[in-house]
Amino acid sequence: MSITIKLGQLAEFLGATLRGDKDKDITGLATLEEAGPGQISFLAKPQYRKYLVDTQAAAVLLKPADADGYTGDALLVPDPYLAYARISHFFDPKPKSSAGVHPTAVIAEDAQVDPAASIGAFAVIESGARIAANVTIGAHCFIGARSEIGEGGWLAPRVTLYHDVRIGKRVVIQSGAVLGGEGFGFVNDKGVWQKFAQIGGVTLGDDVEIGVNTAIDRGALSDTRIGNGVKLDNQIHIAHNVQIGDHTAMAACVGISGSAKIGKHCMLAGGVGLVGHIDICDGVYITGMTMVTHSITEPGSYSSGTAMQPSAEWRKSAARLRKIDDMARRLQKLEKAVETVTCADNRSSDG
């Protein structure tokens, strides 16, 4: 797919200050280092400024403060990275689907599919499901009984929604994602695991995005709930009864244990783990590989573990770590000895 748009049109769309030829054709996006004629680029971080002088880009998205000394065509904006994100959709090569149902799709008689929806090859839509207008369901997707997909949703091939999964508007779900699988609920009866029926569902708000091979389990009693605007990366696990607040984002391989509650506008970096039945307040940032073992009640940044070191230094630190209990006991003895001596000296001075 080839897209051409005038630089002036991009300026108008962004509300940017245009410096250069408004009729210049823009055919794509690229980094400063790799951009060629016809492509627009952006300068978002100071470390990439060194590429600005020699870039072959047709135009560059710049902050006004970064435009001094650059003689090429530019669009001046407050946030070049945000501007890049906004115009990237003009050049998205993702194929556009057409309304209609592929002849190999299997749809229950009582399922409701809007005529403006697109249902791909070998998709299965079960009894009582409802598919709204302008929804795209890719090939080999499975939509379980009574599940609902709101207007403008997009499901890549091989997405699975079990029964009673309710999805808001404009939700994007990537391949391999599974929503509504049974939660991990068992009780031990004299050494034998007995299963809890997982009778809740899954509810997603509007504008949610879910990455490849991410799993969101259904609730044991009430629904597992994902708020509006939540962004989940690839290979994330959300256990039963978890609640995630609006506009929270999680990077790959995060694991959230059952019944945890995460607030609004939080960010969880890659590999973060949460134990179950804890609460995370709004506005929390958790750094990569952190293990969260108790509730967080104050906004801010939180970390656990040790940062990377050269191997030899790390081994020394690990050896010292094993001695911490012994060192603490020795320190307590020293503190008591110092206190005894100090008290004796004070008594001598008083006498």
Swiss-Prot record:
Gene of origin? lpxD
Cytoplasm is among the record's keywords: no
Q: What does this protein do?
A: Catalyzes the N-acylation of UDP-3-O-acylglucosamine using 3-hydroxyacyl-ACP as the acyl donor. Is involved in the biosynthesis of lipid A, a phosphorylated glycolipid that anchors the lipopolysaccharide to the outer membrane of the cell.
Output the PROSITE patterns linked to this UniProt entry: HEXAPEP_TRANSFERASES
Q: GO MF terms on file?
A: N-acyltransferase activity
| Broad EC category | transferase
Which family is it part of?
Answer: Belongs to the transferase hexapeptide repeat family. LpxD subfamily.
* This protein's UniProt keywords: Acyltransferase, Lipid A biosynthesis, Lipid biosynthesis, Lipid metabolism, Repeat, Transferase
- Give the matching InterPro entries: Hexapep, Hexapep_transf_CS, LpxD, Trimer_LpxA-like_sf, UDP_GlcNAc_AcTrfase_non-rep
What EC number(s) are associated with this protein in UniProt?
Answer: 2.3.1.191
Q: Which GO terms describe its biological process?
A: lipid A biosynthetic process
Q: What assembly does the database describe for this protein?
A: Homotrimer.
Q: Name one GO cellular component term.
A: membrane
Q: Report the source organism.
A: Pseudomonas syringae pv. tomato (strain ATCC BAA-871 / DC3000)
Kindly identify the residues recorded as the active site: H240
Matching entries from Pfam families are given as: Hexapep, LpxD
What is the reaction catalyzed?
A: a UDP-3-O-[(3R)-3-hydroxyacyl]-alpha-D-glucosamine + a (3R)-hydroxyacyl-[ACP] = a UDP-2-N,3-O-bis[(3R)-3-hydroxyacyl]-alpha-D-glucosamine + holo-[ACP] + H(+)
Q: What is this protein called?
A: UDP-3-O-acylglucosamine N-acyltransferase
In which pathway is this protein known to take part? Answer: Bacterial outer membrane biogenesis; LPS lipid A biosynthesis
